[in-house]
Amino acid sequence: MLRDALGPALIGVYLHGSAALGDYDPARSDIDILAVCAAPLGTEELARLGARLGRDALPCPADAGLEFSLITVAAARDPAAAPPFELHGWDEHGRVLPGEGRGDPDLPRHFAVVRQTGLVIHGPPATDILRDVPLDEQIALVTDELDWAVGNASRSTQVLTACRAWGLSVDGRYRSKRDGAEWAVERGAPALVAEVLADHRAARESHPDAGAVAAFVASVRTRLQHK
C-alpha cells in the first residue's frame, strides 16, 4: 500500500519490535513499522495516506494495534532529540495523523532498534538510511522508557522493560521482553524475574509484588546511571 501511494518517493520500510524479535503475540503485541520517504509530503497527500493507514481502513492483526511512523530521509539522519515525523499512529482512536512540524522523542530509540534488529520490508538496509545512535544516548533513551513504564505500565512490564535496559547497558544488544528476561535470569536476577518470565511465556497475567518490582527497577536504574 505504501509503495502504491508513494511510488519512487518511498525509500524504505522496516518491521521492528516484537514481530522482528520473535516474541510477537497478537493478543498483547503491537506491530511496529518505520517507513522513510524521500522528502516532506503535502498536506493533502498526508491526509489521504493517513486515512488509508487508519484502523477503519487497515485492520491490524494485533489487538494492540499499529505503531507506525513515516519520516523523511533528512529526519532519519537528524541528530535532534526529537526528529520530525510526517505521519504517526495509531492514536487512541486508531488514527494516523500528520506531524505538522512536531518531533517524536521515541524516534532515536527506534532508529537504534531498527538498525540492529529490524527486518527490511522494502528498500536498502536500515544502516544505510538511519543515523547511528551512540550507545550512551541509547542508554539514556531506555532509561526514559523505563521511567515511563514505572508511571504507566503494569508491574510485569516494568520488570521486563528493566531487563531489556540492563542487557543493553551491558552488551549494547536489543532484546525482546522474553529474551531480556532470560538474559537477566542467567545473570542472577531476583526470583521475581523468573516468575514474570514464566507468566510471559504462558501468556498469563502476572501480578508480582510491588515492593520487589520497585527494588528491582531501582537496582537496574542505578546500573544505567553508572554507565
Region locations from a protein language model:
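Helical scaffold of the NTase/Pol beta-like nucleotidyltransferase catalytic core
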Residues: 1-14, 44-46, 227
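Catalytic metal-binding acidic patch
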Residues: 15-52, 65-70
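Conserved NTP/Mg2+-binding pocket subregion across the NTase superfamily
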Residues: 51-152
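Short, solvent-exposed loop/turn segments at secondary-structure junctions
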Residues: 20, 75, 164-167
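Conserved nucleotidyltransferase catalytic core and NTase-mimicking acidic/glycine-rich helix/loop elements
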Residues: 105-227
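Long, highly charged amphipathic alpha-helices
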Residues: 1, 48-52, 215, 219
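Short secondary-structure boundary/capping segments within folded domains
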Residues: 3-5, 21-26, 58
